[in-house]
């Protein structure tokens, strides 16, 4: 079954907007797991704009108690590798990070940063973390990810979702085809394939229909929708669409 990882970063965004102690990301994570999330994703950014070090400690403890994986998103820096080695999350997803960006704007350039990424990957794997690289569906990046020692690639779906939402059908179709080809290549290299960024109800099914994808990581949309309908209900509808896409492919 296609897995759903729930990113709870933007619960922390709401909390930090008032400099308060609530809403608590760990409470959102607990609700998500109770509602059937297959794992929790959290991004500890260098500027700590949403998730904090304390959140990571609480989320690590929660996921261990619930027997579910924590996917720790992190920049490729010595500081973040050190934090990950101490927290020992189930998975570490290396992502690009620029302080001036509002959200992650694209995939990690594994080709350009190969030596640094390979070294971080080796350190994390030695500590028992399952290492994922967040990349574009580009053949060179996928091959470099395998060469760097990653076990997983997470394909960046943001460009597809933006094109589809904006009504650029031809562009969306071309990007979707690249995602399909990239997923096939990654799987052929022995990499587990995940996907994420920008996914909502309108865009999830074409992505979920790609058979090589094992997991979708969705956050901003689910947290936004939860304001209106509640997190379990938002997740349930997403899960229905994901499962329907897989059933349609099987049929």
UniProtKB/Swiss-Prot annotation:
Q: Which GO terms describe its cellular component?
A: cytosol
Q: What class of enzyme is it?
A: transferase
As recorded in UniProt, its EC number(s) are 2.6.99.2
Q: Annotated Gene Ontology MF terms? A: pyridoxine 5'-phosphate synthase activity
Q: What is its main location?
A: cytoplasm
Q: Which GO terms describe its biological process?
A: pyridoxine biosynthetic process
- Residues holding 1-deoxy-D-xylulose 5-phosphate: 9-10, 45, 50, 103
Q: What does this protein do?
A: Catalyzes the complicated ring closure reaction between the two acyclic compounds 1-deoxy-D-xylulose-5-phosphate (DXP) and 3-amino-2-oxopropyl phosphate (1-amino-acetone-3-phosphate or AAP) to form pyridoxine 5'-phosphate (PNP) and inorganic phosphate.
Its assembly, as annotated, is:
Homooctamer; tetramer of dimers.
User: Per its UniProt record, what PANTHER family does this chain match?
Assistant: PYRIDOXINE 5'-PHOSPHATE SYNTHASE (PTHR30456:SF0)
Tell me which family the UniProt entry assigns to this protein. Belongs to the PNP synthase family.
What is the protein name for this chain? Pyridoxine 5'-phosphate synthase
Give the encoding gene's name: pdxJ
């Amino acid at each position: 079954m296609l897995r759903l990882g729930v990113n709870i970063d933007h619960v922390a965004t709401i909390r930090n907007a008032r400099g308060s102690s609530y809403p608590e990301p760990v409470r959102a994570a607990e609700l998500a797991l109770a509602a059937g999330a297959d794992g929790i994703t959290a991004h500890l950014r260098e500027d700590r704009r949403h998730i904090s070090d304390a959140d990571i400690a609480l989320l690590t403890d929660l996921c261990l108690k619930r027997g579910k994986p924590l996917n720790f998103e992190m920049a490729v820096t010595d500081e973040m590798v050190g934090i990950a080695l101490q927290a020992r999350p189930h998975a570490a997803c290396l992502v690009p990070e620029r302080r001036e960006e509002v959200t992650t704007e694209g995939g990690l350039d594994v080709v350009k940063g190969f030596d640094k990424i390979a070294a971080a990957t080796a350190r994390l794997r030695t500590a028992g973390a399952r290492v994922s690289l967040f990349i574009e569906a580009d053949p060179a990046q996928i091959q470099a990810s395998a060469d760097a020692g990653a076990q997983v690639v997470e394909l960046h779906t943001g460009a597809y979702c933006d094109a589809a939402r904006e009504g650029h059908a031809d562009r969306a179709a071309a990007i979707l085809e690249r995602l399909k080809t990239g997923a096939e290549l990654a799987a052929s290299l022995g990499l587990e394939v995940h996907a994420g960024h920008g996914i909502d109800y309108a865009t999830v099914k074409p992505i979920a229909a790609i058979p090589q994808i094992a997991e979708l990581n969705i956050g901003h949309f689910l947290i936004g929708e939860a304001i209106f309908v509640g997190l379990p209900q938002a997740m349930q509808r997403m899960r229905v669409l994901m499962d329907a896409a897989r059933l349609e492919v099987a049929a």
